Amino acid sequence: LSTHGGRARSTGQPVRVTAIVYTEHAKRFNAMLEKADPRFTAQLVQVDDFGPQTAIMMQQRIDAGEWLVIVGDRVPAREGGRTVTVPFLDGGAPFAQGPWVLAHALACPVYLFFSVKSRGRYHLHFESFAERIVLPRTARQTHIATWAGRFADRLANHCHAAPYQWFNFYDFWAGARSPGDNSSDGRS
């Protein structure tokens, strides 16, 4: 699980890394990347929604030894996409539920990946986040909010350490509700 910070690139690395991106968010950005370096876009898998087909494709890639990267600080592009609002940088912010539901379905370990530029070089930080994400049927939304909150805490820590290196190209706080108010509008 990564964020829109620093620079993420795996060219020349010994592990095959595939980035899973929302198609709607990525169209223009991917076209720009394709012009700059076609090798990078070859490592992108675009999805419209995180459903059963996406989970099957991801499981096949994991079974083949790939590492999958999903940014956890991007909400679904389509209206009504499932989000949870958690505390983040002194306010409430929406975070996608998809990464947590998929990690639960795939029963795979979850690592956090941050990239920070320091002294003219990018440094990659990997953290073990969870050996397994478990979302029991009872209180599922509460468990999702807990995992998203833990992720938001780690992201906030990195934002405080390198405040000009976290970026999103849309209004990140648009539609945010009070933390814990994850009801009513189809986004919970």
Predicted feature locations:
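Catalytic core of membrane glycerolipid acyltransferases/transacylases, capturing the structured
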Residues: 1-49, 64, 78-84
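Non-catalytic C-terminal accessory region of glycerolipid acyltransferases
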Residues: 35, 39, 52-188
